[in-house]
UniProtKB/Swiss-Prot annotation:
Keywords: Cell membrane, Cobalamin biosynthesis, Membrane, Transmembrane, Transmembrane helix
Name by which UniProt lists this protein: Cobalamin biosynthesis protein CobD
Membrane-topology annotation of the record: Multi-pass membrane protein
GO MF annotations in UniProt: ABC-type vitamin B12 transporter activity; threonine-phosphate decarboxylase activity
Chief location category: membrane
Pfam families: CobD_Cbib
Gene, per the UniProt record: cobD
Keyword Transmembrane included in the entry's annotation: yes
Gene Ontology biological process terms in this record: cobalamin biosynthetic process
InterPro entries: Cobalamin_biosynth_CobD/CbiB
Subcellular compartments: Cell membrane
Length: 327
């Protein structure tokens, strides 16, 4: 465990200060892109709308199980090879973990929404937010664009950073690879529409299980970061609203970080959402909070995000140091 804590500490720092390298991923496929291609292949070959729902559910389940097993196997193979490479192997493991985290890339995409609202108005904001959310941006006003960016930031703080870190600590590279596949599968086929309702059902449920603990950890970290940055009362407010409203969210997990961010920022988040021509109803989190969010609220959310990430990184580093000295 001490080694995994050290690797994760270095990976979190590398991802924070360097992040993704666009020039590299223009030349070779990012691992998540490869996962997406595998899912697309399976969906194309096994999600036939002429099949009965029970067959589609079974096809989706076996595709997901098979590809999760392949990811675990790949992780086991790489984990067995790296120790034989000495220092280069240790560096490679840090880089692999960093590649599968998303602190800087997530923050950059969300910051781009705030900047677009300032520079290009609502049309610029809609275009920028469409890069990070699946909902229909054409129906969003400035408040809707800003809330969508903040909601995506809160949810992906869990899905993109805390959860991968958690599963790496639990299962090493095999656990990390398996989680990234599950989360990617959920984002691609775990939708409640006619095309994916049956085929993606298993992937969606598996993602709910995989994110159960990380989502709640993310909310707690955000509330604690709020307390450290703005005082106990602000932290208690974030924690209280999280505990009160998280279960109102249509997702069993996304509501925890989103409600914590809503309470910390004094915003009303979630509520009805437009996906294409379909409206998905849902209650607001922190319904008495401010609804007319704007670019400066995105800025405040980014400050909270980085405070939360700093707290998590600090805890991981502290745990690794304790392990070194005690062990």
């Amino acid at each position: 465990m001490e080694i995994k804590l050290i690797v994760l500490s270095l990976a979190l720092l590398l991802d924070r200060f360097i992040g993704d390298l666009p020039l590299l991923w223009q030349r070779i496929s990012h691992p998540v892109v490869l996962l997406g291609k595998a899912i697309s292949w399976g969906e194309k070959n096994f999600n036939d709308s002429s099949l009965p729902p029970s067959t589609l559910r079974r096809n989706g389940m076996w595709l997901t199980v098979g590809l999760v097993a392949a990811c675990i196997f790949a992780g086991l193979v790489i984990r067995s090879i790296l120790p034989h490479a000495g220092t280069a192997g240790a560096i490679a493991e840090v880089v692999i973990v960093a590649i599968l985290l998303a602190q800087k890339s997530l923050a950059d995409h969300v910051q781009a929404v705030a900047q677009a609202l300032r520079d290009d108005g609502i049309e610029g904001g809609r275009k920028a937010v469409s890069m990070i959310v699946g909902r229909n941006p054409d129906r969003l006003d400035e408040g809707g664009v800003s809330r969508a960016a903040i909601e995506s930031l809160a949810e992906n703080a869990s899905d993109g950073i805390v959860a991968p870190a958690f599963w790496f600590l639990v299962g090493g590279l095999p656990g990390l690879f398996a989680y990234k596949f599950i989360n990617t599968a959920d984002s691609m086929i775990g939708h409640l529409n006619d095309r994916y309702r049956d085929f993606g059902r298993f992937a969606a449920k598996l993602d709910d299980v995989a994110n159960y603990i990380p989502a709640r950890l993310t909310g707690l970290l955000a509330a604690l970061a709020t307390s450290l940055g703005h005082g106990r009362e602000a932290g208690r407010q974030a924690l209280s609203i999280m505990c009160r409203d998280a279960r109102l969210h249509r997702s069993p997990n996304a509501g925890w970080p989103e409600a914590a961010f809503a309470g910390a920022l004094g915003l009303a988040l979630a509520g009805p959402r437009q996906y294409g021509a379909e409206t998905v109803e849902g209650p607001m989190l922190n319904a008495t909070g401010k609804r007319e969010a704007e670019a400066r609220d995105i800025d405040a959310a980014l400050v909270l995000f980085w405070s939360t990430m700093s707290l998590m990184t600090g805890l991981v580093i502290a745990a690794s140091l304790v392990g070194l000295f005690v062990g």
